[in-house]
């Protein structure tokens, strides 16, 4: 198959499509256009275009919407939105709905069910009454936003129409304001229930209740309780519509309890699959480890993308984490990939859907969040990375391809054994023609031609693709000036790599390895990494780079705008990157130093949890001053100490207490030998100790602040020795007899760390002169370490010594490095 890349003009030139793109990419607060806007949005599929349409939407005898006896504004809105001829389900269901009957509508995915209830709702409105008359519920926020866009597009000719969407992730104050003047309310069950409870939404005025994807809304354990609550608050005299592509028999019978003599509108109930959709499956090897199966499926997916030409593809996964991981893998391979899942915020989800519908991405990795109701007409390939849990989900997933009678392709990857048997049961239940994927994949597997609205050009064998500037020259100049001002500030002598790469170093190739972000741990003494010298430069050079980059960006933007004005057309599409499968990539190797940097970055910030470094050795010379990270200070309150005491007492047995007391006594012996071996000059220094306990480090540093109720006296050498002996013996006895006093003593004993630290700070200055031998130097530090832990009677360090978890961490890190080296080989 000849290598080809798909490229289209860079920007839309018509005001209609430009405003549609801005509307879809806007934040949640601006998802709704005003109904009085002078532009119209095309929502319907272009059935008169070059794409093939099957019998799912094409009628044997042509008909039009005027034969359905709709009002004039609705007919004009349908024509403006692009609806030319009704589909079979629209032709049968709209007249029954206009008669006021309760309907249960079942039709194949992508055959125009949203237009059915949107037309019925708009034609039954009384615009002079500004109360909420129609309530539409959808299982996901994305479906609710899509329904709102269809209603506003069809109702563009209805003056004064107020239709709003109410979903989670938006402020309640905004919903309260919109409900003061709202004809049609579209939303998710959770937010609608909340608005009714807060008396923001008056359910007494609702005359039409619509359930889109009714089988999902009434599914047990999903939204059933919320739907029942909302239904009980609505008036008894109302019309109700239930719409879905799949209806289990049990659920269809249960729907009759909500309705008054409902009318079933079913098209092809025995054959729910689309005519123009080819369905394949591929069996992969099964492994005990899940990540091995995922790796093999990913390899098959990349091979499929490289051999099957497609417009847009949807890849479904059963797990959120696996979907995001797959999106990262495909993005690293060069595929324009986006990811959408339920754990993303609302702005990210709407942005991903806007990119899919506006053809700004070729591949969308998703969970079952987008398996229902989402309409993207250019999607002609659906891949199930995991087998769905039920046949309804499978039918909704594959229904994202082949929209409105077009041709499409679906591939399902299943493991050998259980998943394969589950896939066969789904095929038997749905009466579908499921075929094994040919190996090798033939060139003509995708029947639909790709040149219907995409320009095909020969692929260029390049290793770096130029980035397309998406901002205006004025904004680029402002960003460069802000970056230059930040470099000249006295506090920022070392510019961050992020600013330099965004401004003066914008010409860096795309495939270069990015810098790993490093967080500054001010409380731990870890400084942020400075930029390389060649990137920072002097202010004069930086200013010259800024001027040059501004001039080049302005010239490039002006030339691009002139070129676009010549080549663009009203029916063109936004420019997107081409698939990397048609390019030759340069192999990249990593050095051991880069692997170590990657490992340290993963340990510190890989899981987005900052790591506090409590011990940081920078050499004997750097230890003479105040350490950056600081030793354990008196930061534990009495409540925290009481919690530590209770937790240690519940987990420690009697034998643990004995071992701790013996360990303390042995450490006190080491303390005695250390104090006897100390220098005479250190003992001659005046050492003031309070009767109630030694001073804390904060009290020593703040000499002006005198502590209350503390008396000072001289502490000779004998008192220091006796205090350590008695303190070690009394701690082991009092830990058994009076555990309540242990917490207060523990808080008092922590300032001993500070006094030891003051003494240690004075003695370390002479270590470099006294201990010239390397072994003797570390032996002195070992004695100081024993002295420190003898003074710190903290259960944290006891548990650390009793449970050596550092060995487990060492083995884990060893295995991690071995796996990385093995993968590199």
From Swiss-Prot:
Residues 508-518, 733-744 have a biased composition (Basic residues). Residues 646-668 have a biased composition (Low complexity). Residues 300-449 form the Helicase C-terminal domain. Residues 27-50, 465-573, 642-753 are annotated as: Disordered. ATP binds at residues 85, 90, 107-115. The modification Phosphothreonine is found at residues 552, 689, 706. GO terms for cellular component: cytosol; Gemini of Cajal bodies; RNA polymerase II transcription repressor complex; SMN complex; SMN-Sm protein complex; transcription repressor complex. It is an enzyme of class 3 (hydrolase). One of its GO terms (biological process) is negative regulation of cell population proliferation. Residues 465-475, 484-504, 547-571, 698-711 have a biased composition (Polar residues). It comes from the Eukaryota. A motif (Q motif) lies at residues 63-91. SMART domains: DEXDc, HELICc. It is found in: Cytoplasm; Nucleus, Gem. The modification Phosphoserine is found at residues 188, 270, 472, 501, 506, 561, 653, 655, 657, 673, 678-679. Residues 94-265 form the Helicase ATP-binding domain. It catalyses: ATP + H2O = ADP + phosphate + H(+); a ribonucleoside 5'-triphosphate + H2O = a ribonucleoside 5'-diphosphate + phosphate + H(+). One of its GO terms (molecular function) is protein-macromolecule adaptor activity. The SMN complex catalyzes the assembly of small nuclear ribonucleoproteins (snRNPs), the building blocks of the spliceosome, and thereby plays an important role in the splicing of cellular pre-mRNAs. Most spliceosomal snRNPs contain a common set of Sm proteins SNRPB, SNRPD1, SNRPD2, SNRPD3, SNRPE, SNRPF and SNRPG that assemble in a heptameric protein ring on the Sm site of the small nuclear RNA to form the core snRNP (Sm core). Belongs to the DEAD box helicase family. DDX20 subfamily. Part of the core SMN complex that contains SMN1, GEMIN2/SIP1, DDX20/GEMIN3, GEMIN4, GEMIN5, GEMIN6, GEMIN7, GEMIN8 and STRAP/UNRIP. Part of the SMN-Sm complex that contains SMN1, GEMIN2/SIP1, DDX20/GEMIN3, GEMIN4, GEMIN5, GEMIN6, GEMIN7, GEMIN8, STRAP/UNRIP and the Sm proteins SNRPB, SNRPD1, SNRPD2, SNRPD3, SNRPE, SNRPF and SNRPG. Interacts with SMN1; the interaction is direct. Interacts with GEMIN4; the interaction is direct. Interacts with GEMIN5. Interacts with SNUPN; the interaction is direct. Interacts with PPP4R2. Interacts with FOXL2. Interacts with NANOS1 and PUM2. This is Probable ATP-dependent RNA helicase DDX20. It comes from Mus musculus.
């Amino acid at each position: 198959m000849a290598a080809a890349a798909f490229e289209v003009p860079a920007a839309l030139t018509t005001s209609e499509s430009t405003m549609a793109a801005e509307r879809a990419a806007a934040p949640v607060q601006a998802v709704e256009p005003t109904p009085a806007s002078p532009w119209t949005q095309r929502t319907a599929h272009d059935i008169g275009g070059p794409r093939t349409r099957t019998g799912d939407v094409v009628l044997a005898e042509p008909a039009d919407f005027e034969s359905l006896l709709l009002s004039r504004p609705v007919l004009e809105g349908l024509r403006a939105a692009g609806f030319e001829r009704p589909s079979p389900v629209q032709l049968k269901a709209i007249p029954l709905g206009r008669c006021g009957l309760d309907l249960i509508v079942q039709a194949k995915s992508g055959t125009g069910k949203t237009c059915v209830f949107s037309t019925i709702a708009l034609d039954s409105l009384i615009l002079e009454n500004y109360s909420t008359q129609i309530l539409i519920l959808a299982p996901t926020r994305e479906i609710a936003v899509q329904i709102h866009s269809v209603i506003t597009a069809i109702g563009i000719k209805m003056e004064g129409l107020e239709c709003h969407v109410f979903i989670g992730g938006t402020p309640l104050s905004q919903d309260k304001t919109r409900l003061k003047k709202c004809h049609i309310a579209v939303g998710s069950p959770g937010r609608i229930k909340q608005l009714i409870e807060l008396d923001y939404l008056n359910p007494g005025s609702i005359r039409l209740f619509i359930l889109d994807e009714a089988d999902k809304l009434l599914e047990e354990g999903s939204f059933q309780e919320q739907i029942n609550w909302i239904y009980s608050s609505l008036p008894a005299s109302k019309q109700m519509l239930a719409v879905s592509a799949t209806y289990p028999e049990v659920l269809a019978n249960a729907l009759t309890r909500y309705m008054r003599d409902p009318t079933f509108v079913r098209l092809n109930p025995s054959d729910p699959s689309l005519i123009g959709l080819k369905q394949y499956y591929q069996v992969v090897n099964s492994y005990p480890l899940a990540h091995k199966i995922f790796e093999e499926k990913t390899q098959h997916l990349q091979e499929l993308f490289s051999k099957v030409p497609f417009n847009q593809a949807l890849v479904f996964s059963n797990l959120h984490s696996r979907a995001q991981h797959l999106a990262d893998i495909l993005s690293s391979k060069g595929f324009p990939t986006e990811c959408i899942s339920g754990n993303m915020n609302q702005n990210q989800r709407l942005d991903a859907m806007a990119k899919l519908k506006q053809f700004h991405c070729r591949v969308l990795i998703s969970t079952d969040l987008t398996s229902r109701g989402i309409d993207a007409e250019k999607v002609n390939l659906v891949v199930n990375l995991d087998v769905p849990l039920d046949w309804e989900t499978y039918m909704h997933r594959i229904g994202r391809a082949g929209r409105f009678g077009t041709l499409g392709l679906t591939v399902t990857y299943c493991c050998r054994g259980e998943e394969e048997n589950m896939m066969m049961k789904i095929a038997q239940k749905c009466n579908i023609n499921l075929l094994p994927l040919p190996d090798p994949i033939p060139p003509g597997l995708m029947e639909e031609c790709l040149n219907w609205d995409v320009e095909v050009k020969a692929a260029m064998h390049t290793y770096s693709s130029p980035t397309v500037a998406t901002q205006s020259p004025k904004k680029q100049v402002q960003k460069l000036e802000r970056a230059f001002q930040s470099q000249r500030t006295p506090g920022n002598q070392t510019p961050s790599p992020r600013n330099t790469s965004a401004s003066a170093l914008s010409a860096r190739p795309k495939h270069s390895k990015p810098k790993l972000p490093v967080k500054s741990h001010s409380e731990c003494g870890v400084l942020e990494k400075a930029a390389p010298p060649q990137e920072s430069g002097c202010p004069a050079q930086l200013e010259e780079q800024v001027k040059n980059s501004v001039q080049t960006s302005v010239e490039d933007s002006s030339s691009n705008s002139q070129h676009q004005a010549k080549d663009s057309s009203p029916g063109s599409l936004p420019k997107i990157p081409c698939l990397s499968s048609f390019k030759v990539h340069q192999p990249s190797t990593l050095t051991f130093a880069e692997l170590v940097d990657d490992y340290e970055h993963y340990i510190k910030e890989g899981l987005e949890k900052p790591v506090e470094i409590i011990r940081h050795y920078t050499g004997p010379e750097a230890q003479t001053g105040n350490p950056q990270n600081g030793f354990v200070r008196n930061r534990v309150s009495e409540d925290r100490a009481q919690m530590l005491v209770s937790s240690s007492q519940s987990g420690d047995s009697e034998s643990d207490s004995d071992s701790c007391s013996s360990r303390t006594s042995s450490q006190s012996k080491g303390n005695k030998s250390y104090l006897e071996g100390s220098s005479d000059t250190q003992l001659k220094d005046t050492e003031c100790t309070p009767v109630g306990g030694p001073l804390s480090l904060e009290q020593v540093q703040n000499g002006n602040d005198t502590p209350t109720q503390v008396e000072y006296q001289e502490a000779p050498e004998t008192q220091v020795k006796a205090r350590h002996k008695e303190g070690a013996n009394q701690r082991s006895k009092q830990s058994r007899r009076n555990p309540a006093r242990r917490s207060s003593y523990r808080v008092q004993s922590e300032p001993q760390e500070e006094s030891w630290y003051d003494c240690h700070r004075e003695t370390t200055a002479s270590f470099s002169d006294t201990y010239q031998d390397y072994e003797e130097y570390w032996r002195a530090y070992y004695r100081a370490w024993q002295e420190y832990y003898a003074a710190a009677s903290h259960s944290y360090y006891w548990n650390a010594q009793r449970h050596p978890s550092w060995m487990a961490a060492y083995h884990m890190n060893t295995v991690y490095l071995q796996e990385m080296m093995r993968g590199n080989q």
